Amino acid sequence: MQYEAVIGLEVHAQLLTESKIFCGCSTQFGAEPNTQVCPVCLGMPGVLPVLNKKAVEYTVKTGLAMNCKIAPYSRFARKNYFYPDLPKGYQISQYELPLCEDGYLEIMLNGTKRKIRIKRIHLEEDAGKNIHDPSGYSFVDFNRTGVPLMEIVSEPDIRSPKEAALYMKKLRAILRYLGVCDGNLEQGSLRCDANVSVRPVGSTEFGVKTEIKNINSFRFVEKALEYEIKRQIKLIENGEKIIQETRLWDSQTGTTQSMRSKEEAHDYRYFPEPDLVPVVVSEDWIEKIKKDMPELPDQKIERFIKEYGLPQYDSEILTEEKALSEWFEEAVKLGGKPKEVANWIMVELLRLLNEEGKDINECSLKPIQLVELIELINKGTINRNTAKEVFEEMYKTGKTAEAIVREKGLTQISDDSVIIEAIKEVMNKNPKEVERFRNGEEKLIGFFVGQVMKITKGKANPKLVNELIFKILKE
């Protein structure tokens, strides 16, 4: 029997507000433990929360970007559960009346668009962080307690681990474009829980689901889901029951481990938060937020295709990061041809950044430097192979292309007499290959070009080398 996966994702995004959701404490990451706390976020008796308006604005902005209906009236609720990192014994969240509902995101898979519905986006406070010491003691850092958190809940529309990763990437790109979340999975500012079940292909009923926690990279989203889907199918085929539970992804072993039984909503005993008035979002406020919305990834992809004549694939790569798309456009404004600039970014620049685990914001190379390098190629000062060497040196040192070419003596050889001399040297060393070429094996042209480039240390003009070899060998 064939099975299909049914996947829904719950994504928690920490909002880039300067202060926490219900108090004035800083949200800065990396401070000394328990230095960014106050009686409000520590849940001391008698304190009252005051809602951070910017957190509401960011949530509404996200809802609009994800095609949601914005609730004119929403309400906070207390979610009751006991855990060491929750000082009040409850979390202020939203339950029955969230800020945003009924939205969707579109992902592109194998050239086909897939719509993933978004059930709701609600606002809540984050919990603290448990730190487990090797000595056997556990500590709690409450700095994160009360940091504004947006929970984005998808419908169970995702059908494969690949789709789940694409959805996550798209969602993170939108959050970064909006400037509401930095999307850092490693630091925990973007966290993902996955609900997954399997069912026979063609069935419309849902299977028993498990929730997977501790997924902190796009690669692990795929790997965790792949493992869990296989585990569930194996249980079914062995006649065993799947237990509704929360499981922890272990990246070291590549497996999911049972953590606890999965809670239902009634286990949390939700009730309206008595210390906060309902949130009212007026049409005027929504219109004001709409006017401040930036160009989003999908809109930018469409524009890059129309304005610059780029293929869909190139446009998608260049718009994954807002800063990367801006780097590309700056280079084009400075005179670079769009496709040429795109190729250098996608092949060389991204390769070097990935090797160092950096993003474009950490890159010291400027768009003008790439444009100047391309000009040297087009003028015939250097060839493309040499240009790759120059580009890498530019990336490492920050020097201009012209300075590197001058210092290293990389100027392209376009003097016929010098190239002819090199060709004759190759012919004298390889008489058998010359004879084979003259007998019709013209595919050997690549061999001769390679040998000439070797003698000239890659500096000969490849086009001229090609032309002269044909001319001389045909004599």
Swiss-Prot record:
Against InterPro entries, the record matches this protein to: Asn/Gln-tRNA_amidoTrfase_suB/E, Asn/Gln-tRNA_Trfase_suB/E_cat, Asn/Gln_amidotransferase, Asn/Gln_tRNA_amidoTrase-B-like, GatB, GatB_C_1, GatB_Yqey_C_2, Gln-tRNA_amidoTrfase_suB_CS
Q: What S-S linkages are listed for this chain?
A: none
Broad enzyme group: ligase
The Enzyme Commission number assigned here is 6.3.5.-
Q: One MF term from GO for this chain?
A: asparaginyl-tRNA synthase (glutamine-hydrolyzing) activity
Which family, according to UniProt?
Answer: Belongs to the GatB/GatE family. GatB subfamily.
Q: What does this protein do?
A: Allows the formation of correctly charged Asn-tRNA(Asn) or Gln-tRNA(Gln) through the transamidation of misacylated Asp-tRNA(Asn) or Glu-tRNA(Gln) in organisms which lack either or both of asparaginyl-tRNA or glutaminyl-tRNA synthetases. The reaction takes place in the presence of glutamine and ATP through an activated phospho-Asp-tRNA(Asn) or phospho-Glu-tRNA(Gln).
Name listed for the protein in its UniProt record: Aspartyl/glutamyl-tRNA(Asn/Gln) amidotransferase subunit B
Q: Which organism is it from?
A: Thermodesulfovibrio yellowstonii (strain ATCC 51303 / DSM 11347 / YP87)
Task: From the UniProt record, report the name of the gene that encodes this protein.
Answer: gatB
